[in-house]
């Protein structure tokens, strides 16, 4: 934990049970009491995070962080003492810069405690939330080639100390071989993710060739939770593509998002938060995560799946 705190230039760190969800829960518990107000981005909240919020009966105050011009008005409410930010986008048109949002909040109200959900962002961005001025960052080490079910909360010592008191029981703590597995994962995860990013760039370049792939309307990279390839089709064939791709060797569901168990590419529906913003995307868009596969493998599966649909039609 001391090593991880040093990696992220933080005062302290604790490994938690319950992966990223557990880390977020403890981050909230360190600073918020039941029935208090919590400031969040005006967008669909990640389902497991929403469960944490509902279980404490927190009063959710929404603000669109894509436009900071009226943030001062919202923060005039002195009952708002805590803000939860998500590093990756929650809806397709999100454009806010996390660093700017944190700086603006602190400029207006330095007393507001900020917890950043860095799931899907850690080791993919130059700085996580606690390095940008937030009190806490929470993420899953399972998504970084670490052990199953282990999360990480890193940031201010005062708040981390509270969480350590919550976990005074030895059975609740992460230690021994599990803690070592976290460190092992963190040493290679950046390399693995960098290789994956190169494959994603190759896929965008190749699949953007309209004359070669006329059935594809648009293709782009997005931090739709993980940094993935979003492929929009001209026809409503997304669900069929996913079904065919599974038979051709693709994963139909994530197992922790880029965990050590995921080797084939993932052909999957767009995230629930994206679907809440536009339900029709379910029928014409998919997300593809290469995982440990190369661009050629992804294209082969996509092309074969589409041809299979065409031959059936």
Label each PLM-derived region with a short phrase.
Residues 1-2:
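A glycine-/small-polar-enriched, mobile loop at the entrance of the PLP active site in fold-type I
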Residues 143-145, 221-223, 279-280:
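Short, flexible turn/loop "capping" segments at secondary-structure junctions
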Residues 200, 218-230:
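Conserved glycine-rich beta-strand-loop-beta hairpin in the small C-terminal domain of fold type I
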Residues 225-306:
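Conserved C-terminal alpha-helix-loop-beta "cap" of PLP-dependent enzymes
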Residues 6-193, 197-218, 241-243, 289, ...:
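Conserved PLP-enzyme active-site core in the AAT-like
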Residues 212-220, 249-255:
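Short secondary-structure junctions
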């Amino acid at each position: 934990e001391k090593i991880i705190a040093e990696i992220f230039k933080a005062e302290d760190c604790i490994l938690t049970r319950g992966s990223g969800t557990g880390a977020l829960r403890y981050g909230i518990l360190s600073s918020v009491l039941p029935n208090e107000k919590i400031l969040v981005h005006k967008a669909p909240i990640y389902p497991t995070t929403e469960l944490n919020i509902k279980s404490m009966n927190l009063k959710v105050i929404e603000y669109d962080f894509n436009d900071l011009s009226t943030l001062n008005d919202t923060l005039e409410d002195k009952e708002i003492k805590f803000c939860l930010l998500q590093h990756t986008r929650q809806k397709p048109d999100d454009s806010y810069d996390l660093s700017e949002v944190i700086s603006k909040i602190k400029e207006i109200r330095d007393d507001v405690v900020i917890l950043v959900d860095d799931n899907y962002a850690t080791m993919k961005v130059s700085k996580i939330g606690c390095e940008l001025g937030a009190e806490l960052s929470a993420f899953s080490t399972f998504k970084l080639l670490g052990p199953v079910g282990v999360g990480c909360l890193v940031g201010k010592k005062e708040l981390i100390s509270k969480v350590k008191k919550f976990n005074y029981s030895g059975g609740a703590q992460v230690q021994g071989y599990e803690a070592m597995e976290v460190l092992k994962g963190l040493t290679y995860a950046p390399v693995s993710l960098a290789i994956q990013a190169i494959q994603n760039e190759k896929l965008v370049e190749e699949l953007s060739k309209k004359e070669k792939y006329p059935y594809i309307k648009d293709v782009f990279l997005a931090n739709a939770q993980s940094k993935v390839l979003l492929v929009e089709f001209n026809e409503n064939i997304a669900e069929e593509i996913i079904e065919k791709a599974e038979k051709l060797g693709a994963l139909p569901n994530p197992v922790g998002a880029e965990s050590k168990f995921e080797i084939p590419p993932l052909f999957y529906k767009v995230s629930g938060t994206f679907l809440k913003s536009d339900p029709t995307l379910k029928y014409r868009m998919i997300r593809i995560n290469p995982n440990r596969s190369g661009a050629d493998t992804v294209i082969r599966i996509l092309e074969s799946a589409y041809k299979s649909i065409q031959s059936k039609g």
